[in-house]
Amino acid sequence: MSFRSFFDSIALGSIIVCTVLYALIFALSIREYLKMKRLVFILLMIECIGFIYDGIIMVSGKKMSDNILKGTNILRYILHGILVPTLIAFTGYALQFRRDKLYINWVVTLICMILGLLAAASTKMQIEKEFGKIKRCGMHDDTPGWVSSIDTMMNIGSVIYMMIAGIILFIVKREFFYFLAGFFMLIFSAIGPASGNKDLNFLLSVYGEILMIIFLFVFFKKYS
């Protein structure tokens, strides 16, 4: 089996499995919120909704016309731009910031959300080459350079912030779940671009995202 055939054989199945897992974590987060009334579980639910939408669009993309696919992917990018900064908010709750620090943390989160929204709204879409029965959109080369810069800054910056918090939590509490949430997201996000293979980058980011959400849920369930 060629490298390309291997991708084709696992890509669609991976998306479906991850989407089902997001739905499960969404349901479990509802249960935890009803028990504990913690805002962090609402944030987890919102994250899961974004990823579930992401999965549904990718799985059904091949059945859509190009115009409809581009329209649904604009919303994908908007959700991505808004939801990535919530990792900053998660970190404030993980470190148990007092009210003043938590307020500042939320202000930073909201500023980053606005920047992410502006970047997403300025993104020009193009239909990517199909693989693994997945038809998706990506960023067109005509997209302004600042959009890519903000996207990279949000993705890498928020994850590094998580990892720093994870190191602190490990030193203070001997707790490693929060660190692993950021670690897997960073590693899986870095391997793909380093390879220069867009399909590998896409597939690994899918794995990194689901591992991040799983470890976030485990952490907050344990320490809430």
Where in the sequence are the language-model features?
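Membrane-interfacial loop-to-transmembrane alpha-helix junctions, especially the N-terminal start
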Residues: 35-48, 101-108, 172-183, 224
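A generic, lipid-embedded transmembrane alpha helix
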Residues: 45-63
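Hydrophobic transmembrane alpha-helical segments in integral membrane proteins
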Residues: 1-25, 151-155
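C-terminal transmembrane-bundle signature of multipass membrane proteins
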Residues: 84, 158-224
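Non-cytosolic membrane-interface motifs at loop->transmembrane helix junctions
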Residues: 67-78, 135, 198-209
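Internal transmembrane alpha-helix with an interfacial aromatic "cap," most often the third helix
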Residues: 23-33, 57-68, 78-113, 220
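Membrane-proximal helix-loop-helix units in multi-pass membrane proteins
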Residues: 82, 91-160
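Juxtamembrane "helix-exit" motif on the non-cytosolic side of transmembrane helices
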Residues: 30, 58-67, 119-128, 189-199
